[in-house]
């Protein structure tokens, strides 16, 4: 028997080669292919950072089994018996170990949360954002598979069986091996090239026989159904179109994610959304980071209100003791207003903490993490100087101690109180310097404020309301700037005189009887407190007038035209509509007759000359396969369904276009409303400041000779109402600005002009216009 091992060795080597090729199909190779596809997509890196809280501590190819629920574990063991997987243990960590290294901490270990830090932490730790990147990764994997499917693919297989006849002692082991390639080419032609061989081994005596070999090539070319690259490459085409759409969706989600972090509203649908995208309507409610800093400022405003109420209560009590208030009801009303203010302050702080905990969860952080919200973003809205609030609070405490009849105040105590007041000189001078800076900012803003007033006067809707030429006059701004400058100069002089009087009085306390010293010190401290209240109101006025906002001009039709060129979801909507049409084209092709030409050729060898092919052992076949469309009811129904699906997509696309136009019409109306409300709210704060100032002056008026020295019956109520009106107007002013700023951000998103930095932060374009130069 002739033994020929050549063909056997070749086939074994080829089989091992193909097997090694398959072993190279590992996750690392998949990662590399995805990176080649998506390397230029902004913000796309599906691999978690080492300092992410989402990072698996056991970052291995096969995850560690987590700890199971005990009752669920019993079910697994009962059914799977000894083959059940081993349960995890309680010590297994599911959270990344180094995530705290990413936290921007101060020296006390408290996270400092400004806008940039909030965005950075969200991109690191948010499972929502990570999910979107992983969905895009999976979409890229679909493309790698479709490309692999159309490439020439190797295949190899081996089968073996033992054969023994009952009456024979010989045992034969027969093995068959086959290897080759298969692929698609041309106009949908499929081809298969293979090599097969047979091997027989007699186990009883060790004889080896290599059987005949067969080389085969088969080509099948469709002539009707499926006879086009357009058809057989459809799956790859759709996979790559979907990948492009999803890459756009990730970028748009990144923009929407910024809006979510900042305003609490994400209009983006995200990756792997099927069909025509929806257009979410704009919501004027604001949460997120802007909502947090709005709450912080509301708390500051409430603290300033409580400080002013305390100061007013002290002055009213002094007036009551001096006989200038005949009814204690007014003092009690002021005290009740103070209690209400303090209660509101506690409620505001509790609400803020609850909102902050929820925001931590959104960022992917634990709710018990200590966080301090930094609010430089709304620095201009700190109408009340916190230093002055602190000084006023200290002065009120000193006045209470001086006037307390139950307190045993001696001369040394009064001298110490006086020195404490004089120790505030530097802080007072610093606040005066701050007032000058605020006035400088107001002066710098005057030209833009005047232009803004002119635009408001020219609006037709305001003219219809009677707010034309007599409203928003530039002369009022000039007068306001002049008055504030004069007030600042007067206050600087009065404060200097008051501090000089206090200094002399404190130095001469030792020569004055204790009761007289208490009265004089209380009077001077009370006078200083009144000056500080006026200084606080003046600074609030100056800062109020220096606040500005970006311009927004929206023409709905022009904005729609800009969005049609730049909006990523609009690009996807057009592509999705074409995808629906392409489905009808594919379904129509399925209705055609199956007519294929089959060409097949074999080249073989006999069992003796295995591996030595002979032309005499060859064979060539040509055939036609025909399958008529007599029973293609399922294909017919699919085609009809695809036609209906296209019409539905067409209507959805039209609805998408109309919804975009509707959103811009809303933006146009809202922007005008915000612009008007911004100035009206500013005027309301201005009026409230004037009311507080007037009520303060009335309280400090000296008695007129020959007239009733008592205050009016509503003096206390007027002062309390004025302070509460100032609080409400200040909060409303901030709320309008926050809403307007959130709308500006959203408008750039809706236009398709939003640009983010590498850190995911919005690049403010300044004025937001509906007509944008196209790139």
Task: Enumerate the predicted regions with their spans.
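C-terminal motif of bacterial Sec signal peptides marking the signal peptidase cleavage site
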Residues: 17-20
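A glycine-/polar-enriched beta->alpha junction
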Residues: 124-130, 137-152, 167, 180-209, ...
């Amino acid at each position: 028997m002739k033994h020929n091992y050549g063909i056997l060795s070749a086939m074994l080597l080829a089989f091992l080669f193909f097997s090694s090729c398959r072993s190279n199909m590992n996750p690392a190779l998949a990662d590399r292919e995805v990176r080649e596809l998506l390397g230029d997509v902004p913000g796309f890196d599906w691999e978690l950072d080492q300092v992410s809280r989402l990072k698996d501590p056991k970052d291995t190819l096969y995850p560690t089994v987590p700890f199971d629920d005990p009752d669920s574990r019993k079910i697994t063991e009962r059914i799977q018996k000894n083959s059940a997987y081993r349960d995890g243990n309680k010590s297994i960590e599911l959270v990344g170990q180094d995530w705290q290294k990413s936290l921007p901490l101060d020296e006390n270990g408290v996270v400092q949360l400004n806008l940039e830090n909030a965005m950075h932490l969200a991109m690191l730790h948010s499972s929502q954002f990570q999910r979107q990147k992983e969905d895009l990764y999976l979409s890229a994997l679909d493309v790698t598979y479709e490309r692999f499917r159309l490439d020439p693919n190797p295949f190899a297989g081996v089968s073996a069986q033992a054969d023994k006849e009952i009456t024979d002692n010989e045992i034969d082991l027969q093995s068959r091996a086959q290897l080759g390639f298969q692929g698609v080419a041309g106009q949908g032609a499929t081809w298969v090239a293979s090599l097969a061989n047979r091997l027989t081994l007699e186990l009883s005596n060790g004889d080896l026989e290599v059987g005949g070999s067969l080389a085969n090539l088969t080509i099948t070319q469709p002539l009707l159904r499926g006879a086009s690259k357009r058809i057989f490459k459809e799956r790859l085409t759709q996979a790559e179109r979907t990948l492009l759409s999803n890459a756009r969706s990730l970028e748009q989600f990144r923009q929407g994610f910024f809006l979510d972090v900042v305003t609490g509203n994400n209009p983006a649908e995200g990756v792997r959304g099927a069909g025509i995208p929806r257009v979410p309507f704009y919501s004027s409610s604001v949460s997120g980071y802007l909502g947090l800093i709005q709450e912080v400022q509301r708390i500051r405003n409430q603290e300033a209100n409580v400080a002013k109420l305390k100061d007013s209560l002290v002055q009213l009590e002094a007036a009551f003791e001096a006989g200038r208030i005949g009814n204690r009801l007014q003092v009690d009303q002021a005290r009740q207003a103070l209690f209400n203010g303090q209660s509101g302050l506690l409620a505001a702080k509790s609400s803020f903490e609850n909102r902050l905990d929820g925001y931590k969860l959104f960022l992917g952080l634990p709710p018990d993490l200590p966080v301090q919200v930094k609010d430089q973003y709304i620095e201009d809205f700190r109408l009340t100087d916190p230093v002055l609030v602190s000084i006023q609070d200290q002065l009120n405490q000193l006045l209470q101690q001086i006037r307390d009849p139950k307190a045993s105040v001696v001369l040394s105590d009064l001298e110490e109180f006086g020195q404490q007041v004089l120790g505030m000189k530097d802080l007072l001078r610093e606040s005066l310097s701050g007032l000058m800076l605020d006035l400088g900012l107001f002066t710098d803003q005057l030209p833009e404020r005047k232009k803004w007033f002119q635009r408001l006067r020219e609006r037709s809707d305001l003219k219809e309301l009677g707010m034309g030429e007599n409203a928003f006059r530039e002369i009022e701004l000039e007068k306001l700037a002049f008055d504030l400058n004069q007030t600042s100069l007067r206050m600087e002089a009065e404060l200097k005189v008051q501090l000089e009087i206090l200094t002399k009085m404190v130095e001469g306390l030792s020569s004055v009887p204790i009761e007289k010293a208490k009265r004089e010190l209380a009077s001077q401290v009370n006078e200083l407190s009144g000056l500080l209240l006026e200084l606080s109101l003046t600074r609030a006025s100056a800062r109020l007038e220096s606040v500005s906002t970006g311009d927004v001009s929206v023409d709905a039709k022009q904005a729609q035209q800009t969005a049609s060129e730049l909006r990523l979801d609009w690009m996807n909507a057009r592509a999705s509509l074409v995808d629906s049409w392409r489905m009808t084209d594919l379904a129509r092709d399925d209705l055609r007759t199956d007519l294929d030409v089959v060409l097949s050729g074999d080249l073989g060898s006999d069992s003796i000359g295995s591996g030595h092919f002979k032309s005499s052992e060859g064979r060539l076949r040509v055939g036609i396969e025909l399958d008529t469309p007599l029973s293609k009811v399922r294909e017919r129904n699919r085609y009809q369904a695809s036609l209906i699906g296209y019409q539905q997509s067409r209507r959805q696309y039209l609805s998408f276009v109309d919804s975009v136009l509707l959103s811009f019409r809303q933006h146009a109306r809202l922007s005008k409303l915000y612009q008007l409300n911004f100035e009206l709210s500013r005027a309301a704060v201005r009026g409230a400041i004037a009311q507080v100032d007037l009520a303060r002056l009335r309280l400090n008026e000296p008695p007129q000779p020959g007239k009733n020295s008592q205050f009016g019956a509503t003096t206390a109520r007027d002062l309390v109402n004025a302070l509460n009106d100032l609080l409400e107007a200040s909060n409303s002013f901030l709320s309008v600005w926050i809403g307007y700023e959130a709308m500006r951000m959203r408008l750039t998103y809706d236009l398709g002009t939003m640009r983010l930095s590498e850190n995911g932060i919005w690049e403010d374009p300044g004025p937001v216009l509906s007509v944008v130069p196209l790139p």
